[in-house]
């Protein structure tokens, strides 16, 4: 700090160099209270939302709280997660409630500042992760005058609205694609130029089904060829057992029945069933993936302790498949829909990056409004 040149209008503090008018303050001094919620009951027909560690978790016929508050998940895997509540509501006992002193601290500014702080770094406990009100009260933050807080919150709010709008667009595109899949893959909607009947086949007649060799977890690394298991990508390995992309179904564990499309040159473990159509020239692999992912394998899951799908029932699983040209045309339509969703997701991530960069500048006073 002694070797730093402090710009005009700034000052040195324990948190670094901040604008002269800003003050380093404890969250406890900026809040009227920080305490746990009290609700432990739900009412299916209640009118008041009950907030928990993941947002609204139910409803109640009565409410304990009223007005704006910031909520922080207190315990469990979501400890440190933020939410905002207003109106009349209730809060579960696994959630901390921060009531702000609105004459010195703007709620929207505070929410952004706590988001930027990343509260999950305060979480402790290996068995049951936890964050306490005392920890929150001791958080020190650089705080500008109230008018500047509101201006900063207003600017960040523009990005919030853009992010929310883009997220809604992605939801709409996903719903549209899902509806399109259901109609195209059931032949309820036929593309122009196609009218031939679809054939009913068994999965074992069009694909080779097998579970590859499983590798040990200690053999996985951070580099090499991707390895796909029961939960999708699980690591990397120095070799691959499939040169071309493959359609796979998770056949063990809680995600049993989940369909994935692996890339070429990857290792697929024995926790996944490969549906290999490489040697079937009458099947378009992209179409096959969409068809399988639109199918339900719930009725094939067996085992009470460890859910699993075994090969024999899968071999007999019935599908309806159109001629190859129609398969290709359908795959092209659905691939275009996927690409549209991917582009929308890329834009959403750009907006989020822009907001994070803006927060870094505005919430530290490096950039003034």
Predicted segments with their positions:
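Amphipathic alpha-helical coiled-coil/heptad-repeat segments
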Residues: 1-21, 142-199, 320-369
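Non-catalytic DNA-recognition/assembly elements of restriction-modification systems
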Residues: 8-37, 45-51, 146, 192-213, ...
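Structural detector for helix-capping/boundary residues
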Residues: 13, 25, 54, 117, ...
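Proline-centric
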Residues: 16-21, 96-106, 119-121, 134-153, ...
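A short beta-sheet element
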Residues: 52-115, 124-127, 132-136, 229-293, ...
